[in-house]
Amino acid sequence: MLKQRREKQQQMELVIMEQMVPEDHFLRKVDRAVDFSFIYDLCAPLYCADNGRPAIDPEILFRMLLVGYLYGIKSEARLEEEINYNIAYKWFCGLDLTDKAPDATTISQNRRRRFRDNNIAEEIFNEILRQCMAKGLVGGAILYTDSTHIKAKANKHKKKLVEVAVTPKAYLSELDAQVDQERKELGKKPFDRDDEAHKGGGSATRMQSTTDPESGQQSRDGKPNGFYYSEHRTVDSKRNVIVNVHVEAANINDVTPMPEILDEVERRLGKLPKYMGLDAGYHNAWIAHLLETKGIQGVIGYRRHTHKGAHYGKYRFRYDPDRDEYICPEKQRLTWKTTTREGYRQYCCEGKTCKGCPRRAECFGASMNRKVVERHVWQDALERVDAFTKTHRGKRIYGWRKETIERSFAEAKENHGLRYARMLGIRNMREQCFLTAAVQNIKRLVASFYRAF
């Protein structure tokens, strides 16, 4: 028989909060698997020990933030509301059933004032990583690094053209020394390097967002146009634990921060990996040389030849490493003549040899009198990387990228709100990236904790 309840009776009930949160709830698992006591040690210097009004427990604040990142709750006002209505969230944050969650402005004011000039988010990430390492979740032998773009909280139409300082590239001094040495071997004078590119102090024009000036305009092929940040992430192959996070504006080339990334990885893990997997965006001679000097075997995606000109590309010429010469399609040898300021060796024949060649029109333009082929001074390192990548082991290591770094980024964007920046400025972007990586590593800790039983 159909029955409709027309009025609700008010009644008092005695409830035990512990019984209202299921034993298999994910937040219960997090509470068992992760030791959060380190938060007090991190925050102690930021609070007065014996004076002032009692503050909100910092562990409650950070547990609230972790709930927001775990469940993709982007707004702090929405987070406050969800915690007030969700018993499991309240239980995890250490609140009683009738306690109100700290106000959203409490979190934002703590961020702006108390936590502004320190790296609390990074330290939380570091501690979670240390717990992962203590549980044996980080192998450290094979790492993968890649970057992903994160849309800044900025309108792409609100922008202006500004002049910015140009920083000399990190590898210039090492490259210059090698170029000078090679020119000396050829009996040529070293280059004068008093230009702005080497001394610093040069400038260039860039499009800058008026809403978030620290973001960078992205205008690469195959990427969305607008203002973005780039997160450079490094993950371990064993359990897909994130071991490093590095944030830059999106107009910084992916290869530029690689020396800093390697230093950060070594500082966090205490060692460098044996292998490092990178996609084709890192396929250049400097990266291969950098990895080789650090004792790391690079496994880098190969870039296909994209030469579409009317004349022969470099790939039509075969390199002879024993004689350090190139051999053209007509079996003529191109010898090393000089090394350019940019670090490229130039190989060519005598002018009369090219002038009488039957393939001259297809080989080079009418304004030139001979074909010139260039080879970077660090090209040998890149070719050794390519040779290893084509081996059976190299192919297996590179193939794991989609299961590690690509999966890690997909998880962060789909489940934890990393597709968009939550706040303005690179400092807030770093906080978002570090806390997102921390909750992803917490999920690995939970999986490991329950796998052990």
What residue ranges belong to the model's regions?
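Short alpha-helix boundary/capping elements
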Residues: 38, 69-72, 87, 91
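Hydrophobic alpha-helical membrane-insertion signals
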Residues: 1-28
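Short, solvent-exposed coil/turn linker segments
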Residues: 16, 34-38, 94, 161, ...
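Anion-binding and metal-coordination hotspots
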Residues: 3-4, 72-85, 95-453
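Short secondary-structure boundary/capping segments within folded domains
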Residues: 18-20, 53, 223
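N-terminal catalytic cores of NTP/NDP-binding nucleotidyl/phosphoryl-transfer enzymes
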Residues: 60-68, 74, 79
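Short glycine/serine/threonine-biased micro-segments
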Residues: 50, 92, 423
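Basic, short loop/linker segments at the boundary and entry of helix-turn-helix/winged-helix-like folds
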Residues: 23-66, 376-377, 381
